[in-house]
A protein has these predicted regions:
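Conserved GNAT-fold acetyl-CoA-binding loop/helix
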Residues: 29-49
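Short, P/G- and charge-enriched loop/turn segments at secondary-structure junctions
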Residues: 49-51, 147-148
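Acyl-donor (CoA/ACP) binding surface of acyl/acetyltransferases
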Residues: 1-32, 61-180
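A short helix-loop-beta-strand connector motif used in the catalytic cores of GNAT acetyltransferases and
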Residues: 50-63
Length: 180
């Protein structure tokens, strides 16, 4: 699948993206709210997990590109959120591209695709409660906090969600999407 927004292209990740993804997932500042940054083997597993999800589900975390350059990942994955497997919108953007709206734009596109192409009744984002940039991105895309809980692996987590009806009422074409 390929998703085009006004500034970004989201596409399936390949092994050719390893170096660019490793630069993001191994960076201590970027991965501050994860248990630890990823090593090379972990990044290879990440890419394989994404590719397996494309084959099994038709969705996953896609490579986010700006003018052909890999700047992060964003997409839909099924995650165990407080004991339930739910469709989650997740994102990681290279830190030299933070605060430019790319995470919000990519996430908005993925929310639209989750509702329009995959028919999910609601989508979720969850993150460490201290990860303010991430929960602000969720809120910018119309999500509201619906839960909070402590997880042995990630600590205290906030859960945000938006259902399809709410999304349709507030949907704008700020981030027009063309998915192929």
């Amino acid at each position: 699948m390929r998703i085009d927004t006004s500034r970004l292209v989201l596409r399936e990740m390949t092994e050719d993206d390893f170096d660019a993804l490793y630069a993001i997932l191994s960076d201590a500042e970027t991965m501050k709210y994860y248990p630890k940054p990823y090593d090379e083997a972990g990044v290879h597993r990440w890419i394989n997990w994404c590719r397996d999800s494309y084959a099994k589900n038709g969705f996953g975390l896609w490579a986010v590109t700006l003018n052909g350059e890999f700047i992060g990942d964003c997409g839909i994955s099924l995650q165990p959120i407080n004991g339930q497997w739910l469709p989650e919108i997740g994102y990681h953007i290279r830190k030299d591209h933070w605060r430019k709206g790319y995470a919000s734009e990519a996430a908005a596109a993925c929310i639209r695709v989750a509702f329009e192409q995959f028919g999910f009744p609601a989508v979720y984002s969850y993150m460490n409660a201290d990860n303010e940039p991430s929960w602000r991105t969720a809120m910018k895309n119309g999500m509201n906090q619906v839960d909070a809980y402590t997880d042995d692996h990630h600590g205290y987590l906030r859960v945000f969600a938006i259902d399809r009806n709410t999304w349709e009422k507030q949907c704008t074409d700020e981030y027009a999407v063309h998915a192929k």
